[in-house]
Amino acid sequence: MRALSANLFAVLLMCALASVFYVWSALENRLERHKRGSSVPDGGSFHQGPSEDHSAKTFRALLAVPVAQRQNSAGRSKAQNLTNPSAFVGSRDYHVNGDDERSAQREGPVKLGYPVDDGIFWSNWLEDVLPVRFTEGYAEAWRSKARTSPVVKLEPGCGRISNQLATFADGTKACVRYGINADQVQGETLTYYLASLLGITNLPPLVLSQLNGDSAQWVAVRTRINNLQWSDRAVVSLTEWISNLTGVVTPAPLRQESSGLLPALRCFENKTTAELLELMQWSDLIVFDYLTANFDRLVSNLFSLQWDPHVMERDTNNLLKTPHGDLVFIDNEAGLVHGFRVLNMWEKYHHSVLSSVCVFRKRTMQRVAELHRRRDSRQRLLELYRDSEPLSQELGFLSDEHAAVLQDRIDQLYKHIMQCKEKYNQL
C-alpha cells in the first residue's frame, strides 16, 4: 500500500510539472509572438514571426535539460575562398540574386513538362526560376559590416525576451541572440554554416560578436546591456533583420491527412510555378531540419498534433516568407547541438517527416552525396566555420560525439534518397 501511494504521488508530481511547463511555454510563446508583431520606432513593422499562434511550444521546456559537455577544437584549418565582391550592404530590404528578372516567371503558369526529373528530382526549369536568396557575396559583405558597426540601440522585437533587436549607427538592424545557454548560439551559428556547406541559401546572414561595454561596437548601449544582465565577454550572434515577412502554413501534401511529397502525385500538374517553387523549398527545409535535428519547426507541429489537430493549419514555427514567396528559415537555435542532445526524444518525429518526402533538389542532394562519399562533414564544416568566423574559437565547435551524429544523419539521408530513387526512378 505504501509503495502504491508513493507511485501515485510520483505520477501526480510529474503531471503537475508537465502542466507548469505547458502553461509557461504557451505564455512565453504568446509574448514572443506579440513582440514580434509589434511596431518598431521608425514606423516599420517587424515581421519575424506570425502575430498569433495557439499551439504549444515544446522547445522552452526542453531548455531545462542540462548543458552537455562541449569541446573546443584546437588549430586552424586551411582557408576556403567564400567571398564575392558584389553585394548590397546596409539595406533593410530582402535581396535575392536576379529577383527582378525571375519574379514574372514565378507568377506565371507552369511550363510544359512534368515538374520532376529522373524520378525524384525537381526539374531543371524550376531550379532555374528559383533565385539565390542570400548570395555568398551579399552575406560576406553584411557579416563584414556587422562585425564593426556600432550598436546604438537595443530593444525587444526578436522573439524570446533574452533576444534583442539591435539598431546600428547607419539605421540598419539585426537580431541579437543571447542564449539561455551557449548551446543556442552555437547551434544557430553552426546550423548557418552547415546550410552554406549544403548550398541552402534561405538563412539570413549571421555573425558573432563578443559583448564588451567598453568596445566601440557596444559602448553606446552599455547601460542597456547591464540592465539585461548580459555577461561581459559573452559571445552573441547577430542575424540580419529582414522586413516585410509573413507566416507560412504547412502545404497540403505535407499534412497528416496526405500521403506526402511524392513524385507520383498527380496534383503537381495543377500547381502554379509559385506553388511548385514553395514546395521545392519545403523539400530543402525538411532535409535540412533532419540533418540538424531541429525539432522547433515542422517536427514540433507534428508532435503537437496529439492535443491540437489543427496545428498544421496555422503558421509554422520559425519559418517566414517574402512577398515573392521565398522561404526564410529563422531562429535555428534548436539545430545540431541542442537537437542532438535531445535526439532520443524526437527521432521518431524526424524520421516520420523525412519519410514523407521523396522529391529533392538535385543540387542539394549532390552535396549530400559528396559528404556521404567522403565522410568528411566534420572537417569541412569546421574549416568553413573557422575561415568565416573570427570568434569560432571562443564559441567552440561540435563535440566528437555530435560530429559523428551529423555524419550518421548524412548517411541515413543518403540511404533514404537511394530508396526513393529505387522506388520512383521508372516514373
Swiss-Prot record:
Name of the gene this protein is made from: fjx1
Subcellular location: Secreted
Function: May act as an inhibitor of dendrite extension and branching.
Xref: CDD domains: Four-jointed-like_C (cd10468)
Entry annotated with the keyword Zinc-finger: no
Keywords tagged on the record: Glycoprotein, Secreted, Signal
CC annotations in GO: extracellular space
Classification via InterPro entries: FJX1/FJ (IPR024868)
Biological process, per Gene Ontology: cell-cell signaling
Glycosylation (residues): N81, N244, N270
Signal peptide: 1-18
Organism: Xiphophorus maculatus
Protein name in UniProt: Four-jointed box protein 1
